[in-house]
Amino acid sequence: CRRCRVTSPPTTLPKARTLVLARDDRWAGPLCDGLDKVGWRTATCRGIGAALVALQDLGIEVAIVDLTENAAEGFAAAARMKAAYAPRRLPVLALGDPDGSGEGGPFDLIMRPPVHPTQIALRLESLARAAVTEEEFDLRAQTLAERGKRLEPPKVEQGPLQILTVGEPAPKFLALSHALRACGAETTGAFTSYTAFDYLHERSFDAVVLWAGQGQAEALSIAAGMRRNTRLFHIPTMLYLHSGSDIGPNEAYDRGITDLATGDTPADETARRVVALARTHRREAAIRRALEKARGSGLMDAATGLFTRDLFAAHLARLSTAMHARHRPLSVAVLRISESPELGLMRSEGWLDRAIPQIGSMIGRLVRAEDTVARLAPDVFALAFPAANQEAARVAAERIGAVIACTAFDAGPGRTPFSITFDLGAAELEPGETAAHALERAGSRASARRAS
């Protein structure tokens, strides 16, 4: 963890993603060491002067402010950092809750120490994504405005947040349910995975809390199952562990977990974190609905509702400029439907053309709200992933391909449904490279995989 004092500018740390503002290392030191190990590299500043310099010089995505020593100073510093970061959006997490209210002011989330780096890492991921989503909405509105179309502002659904709690009625889990209701949320309890999925398919929820109890297997299985379903894919999930349990952030993320909490964490704080996840989900859902309305603009691909080749090229150029200005990565992926004798027959008989709208719709639902999907050619799709590296883009593309490969498409009366697979490639925009060239590299990698 790199330390930067207010009397001098911070030492350059190109890979730093997290700015930590703390007077000492009582909580910040161990937290930074842990975040460094799980991929959220940190730069620590002792005062607001150095923090403002760091925001300009480093590729910072989120900030953490220690409130345990001087809360008033921390609140003022957070407000100044957000203002200095504009028009970019800077998520700021507070470490400490001096008045016990959990109310954030300039903070996007407040957590009480001690906190495990895994918990922080997962929340940072969610906060950073939310910021990128808001920025992407603005960028997409600009792209459409150039073509005379107005993108209506998102309309967030009103009413109590709907939370599904899944697991045995253990005392600490029941306490969390009570705390959620005290926060104004409505909770629905499911004791088994079967009941949980019945509820998930029948009703809409803003977040799901999974009680691990004495074992994590069933809870992780539910989360993984949600990530394989296009309708449930984006619902945030919190894994509530019993005291003494642990799980690595990579494993948690791979299994579909959005956040972690343990029985050692006060129920009211865990409830506030669940509510924050649920609110973010509602906001993202509203943005997604607003973006989907653009399908009726006459600018999108008629069959799939996705971006056309030309519209995607224009937006990708704007996105590339924005990501460069924000010191964020930008990656692209190409998905090309794989050829096979069976698919050739389906193509010749017109069944593939009939499946294309469903395929395009599935791809559109399986990406994040901030990602852009286009149909470049009859059987070629492209995706743009802001604030994502090449590996993240590749993994996302492979997940999309895996879900669609499990889908049965109609081949006509009395015939066995057919399936499709993709040749895929991903590329991260390199310094000085155009977005179009990066897309060509991704396409070449997809072609190479087909040839192999």
Please report, for each region that a protein language model flagged, where it lies by residue.
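Conserved helix-loop-beta segment at the catalytic/binding core of cyclic-nucleotide signaling proteins
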Residues: 299, 360-393, 402, 406-409
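Non-catalytic signal-transmission and effector/linker regions of two-component phosphorelay proteins
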Residues: 1-34, 38-43, 49, 56, ...
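C-terminal output helix
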Residues: 115-124, 128, 265-274, 278
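Alpha4 helix (beta4-alpha4-beta5 surface) of REC/receiver domains from two-component response regulators
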Residues: 73-76, 94-111, 118, 221, ...
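Amphipathic HAMP/coiled-coil signal-transducing linker helices
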Residues: 289-308
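Conserved phosphotransfer microenvironments
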Residues: 48, 61-88, 92, 96-99, ...
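Conserved long alpha-helical elements within nucleotide-processing catalytic cores of c-di-GMP signaling
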Residues: 308-320, 324-331, 338-364, 374-378, ...
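A short glycine-enriched loop-to-beta-strand structural element that forms part of the catalytic core
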Residues: 375, 380, 384-386, 412-443
